[in-house]
Design a protein with these regions (language model features):
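Positively charged, low-complexity terminal tracts
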Residues: 2-204
Length: 204
């Protein structure tokens, strides 16, 4: 399978929108080489799927971060109507956090300028019957006042295989999540803690 993947000259049809990327080698982690992939946000298609989140949780399982977004039943004590689960590898979480901390207009600064504080994430109870799950490899987040927005994208191993040579990447828009800015900032803080806790498990 690996040999076949390496011989593919172009991105396969159906992998997603092909965008130009800048590949920058980075310092190795755990003895393994790694690189950052950067692209212009304006070149990324906006996901068609939309989800309005009232709350968020963070989990970890089998080497993956689980970002959970929930819609609460109105008039209840946080009982969930629906739940959206986004699964990301730790290396992709690290890429997102690096981007947040090094951005020209840092997320924390943008939130603080509106007087919004990071919210503590609640303790997760149980999944509602209406639960869906997606994979993601890229996160794009933004805030404006009290409102936050997170776009998730996925690039398959097939798409990533040729990136270093072609300087192009096929990205599949997964879902856009609308969430409070304070809740988004609280999630970012917890993701940083998760990375520190599991830093020895990052494989690339």
């Amino acid at each position: 399978m690996s040999k076949g993947m390496s011989n593919m000259p172009h991105q396969r049809p159906g992998e997603g929108t092909v965008v130009d990327v800048v590949v920058t080698p980075l310092e190795s982690v755990n003895g393994l080489g790694r690189a950052s992939l950067q692209t212009q946000i304006s070149s990324l298609p906006v996901p068609n799927k939309r989800y309005s989140a009232d709350t968020a949780f963070l989990g970890y399982s089998h080497g993956y971060a689980k970002l959970l977004f929930g819609q609460e039943k109105f008039g209840t004590d946080g009982e969930l109507r629906t739940l959206l689960i986004i699964k990301l590898g730790l290396s992709w979480v690290r890429s997102f956090i690096d981007g947040v901390n090094k951005a020209e207009f840092p997320l924390r600064q943008a939130v603080a300028s509106s007087g919004v504080q990071a919210e503590a994430l609640p303790e997760f109870r149980e999944e509602p019957k209406d639960t869906v799950s997606f994979d993601a490899t890229m996160i794009v987040a933004g805030v404006n006042g009290v409102d936050g927005c997170v776009d998730f994208y996925y690039s398959s191993p097939f798409a990533l295989e040729r990136t270093a040579v072609s300087k192009k990447l096929a990205v599949d828009p997964v879902v856009r999540v609308n969430v409070r800015a304070g809740l988004l900032l609280g999630l970012v803080d917890q993701l940083e803690t998760l990375l520190e806790t599991h830093k020895d498990e990052i494989v690339n």
